[in-house]
Amino acid sequence: MRICNLGSLNIDRVYGVEHFVSAQETVLATKYERFLGGKGLNQSIALARSGGTVFHAGAIGPDGMSLRQLLEENGVDTRYLKDTHTASGHAIIQVNASGQNCIIVSRGANAEILPEDIDRILSDFGQADLLLLQNEISNVDYAIQAAKARGMSVAFNAAPVTPELHTYPIDLVDYLIVNEVEGLSLLGCLLYTS
């Protein structure tokens, strides 16, 4: 099975803090680190390292060459990456003294995945293949429907929770990946819409 990960690519800025910043508060960071990430990138690398045949489809900006390079260094095929003029996605991550985090994500180029991009990418995949998605990109609902129309299996990581999440055709998803917060939110949406 080939895996097409239509996934996010982010530049992560991680700040260690004693406590999460509150409204109208300024705190000093105890540590700063910069990483290449995004749920999509992380999942593609993990799958490739586990022996999977992984194609990463997504979008990067002019600042995203290091994202492409990291994927390729880890055996991920990047032929479906779209170069845009928009800055690559990025995240600001606070990690408190007990190791919990709060994350703000700017989609950047991740928001430039268009239906025609999805159709072009998926035209190379079929019934024996898996589409992996995260909710950090645009047109997730379209991608789910397009993949199922091609007979593909679909795995969806429902993070982050967004207002449109409850409108997605979750019934078409074969594998749903959630943490506690996302699971509770999704269950709440399903309870209110059924």
Regions found by a protein language model. Give the residues of each.
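Conserved phosphate-binding/catalytic loop of the ribokinase/pfkB sugar-kinase fold
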Residues: H56, L81-D83, I93-L130
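Conserved small/polar residues in nucleotide/adenosyl-binding loops
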Residues: Y192-T193
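Short gly/ser/thr-rich secondary-structure transition/capping motifs
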Residues: G75, A111-E116, A155-V161
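Positively charged, low-complexity intrinsically disordered leader regions
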Residues: M1-S22
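Substrate-binding N-lobe of the ribokinase-like
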Residues: R2-I3, A23-H90
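Short beta-strand/loop segments at the ligand-binding rim of alpha/beta enzyme cores
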Residues: A147-A155
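Short, glycine/polar-rich helix-capping loops at beta-to-alpha or helix-loop-helix junctions
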Residues: V161-Y168
